[in-house]
């Protein structure tokens, strides 16, 4: 009888250890503290976030899911004419495509450095990108930081004077929900 209980106990323990529990945290953007900037050539500016969904677990990054929507109408280069050009049909075409979307399909991490592989949609064109980032965990708060480049012609941004490559920099302070 004792040996049966021991065997059953070991079997239950073995089965329980085969399943891992993930503890991904749901992070909320700090509305007035973030920055999404772009620069390239003589162009630089900011764009505002419309919405985010950040489910991130630094111990198990493969369980993470990140989605962000940016509001094209909020582009600000500090120059009214340049803003108008950026939102025009040969720029980002804010009228027809008011949102830029990023949605991760995989998140990996190693030694505090992470990468979100995802689909970036600009002007109705979707390309897979790799977004390297760091995460500074401060308990109930944290900060995501990352930089990546986009080739403007890949997204049919053809306005004369537009740089071939734009560097996008993210500084995203968050709170744990």
Task: Specify the residue positions occupied by each region the protein language model found.
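Low-complexity, acidic/polar, glycine-enriched regions of mature
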Residues: 19-177
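Bacterial Sec-dependent N-terminal signal peptides
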Residues: 1-26
């Amino acid at each position: 009888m004792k040996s049966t209980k021991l065997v059953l106990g070991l079997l239950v323990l073995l089965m329980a250890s085969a399943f891992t529990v993930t503890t991904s945290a749901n992070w909320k953007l700090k509305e007035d503290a973030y920055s999404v900037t772009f620069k390239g050539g003589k162009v630089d500016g900011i764009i505002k976030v419309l919405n985010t969904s950040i489910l991130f677990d630094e111990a198990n990054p493969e369980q993470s899911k990140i989605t962000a929507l940016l509001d094209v109408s909020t582009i600000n280069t500090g120059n009214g004419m340049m803003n108008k050009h950026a939102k025009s049909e040969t720029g980002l075409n804010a009228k027809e495509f008011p949102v830029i979307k990023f949605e991760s399909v995989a998140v990996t991490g190693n030694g505090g450095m992470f990468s979100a592989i995802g689909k970036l949609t600009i002007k109705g064109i979707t390309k897979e990108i790799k977004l390297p980032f760091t995460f500074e965990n401060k308990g109930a708060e944290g900060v995501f930081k990352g930089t990546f480049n986009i080739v403007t012609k890949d997204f049919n941004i053809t306005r004369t004077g537009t740089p071939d490559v734009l560097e996008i920099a993210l500084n995203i302070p968050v709170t744990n929900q």
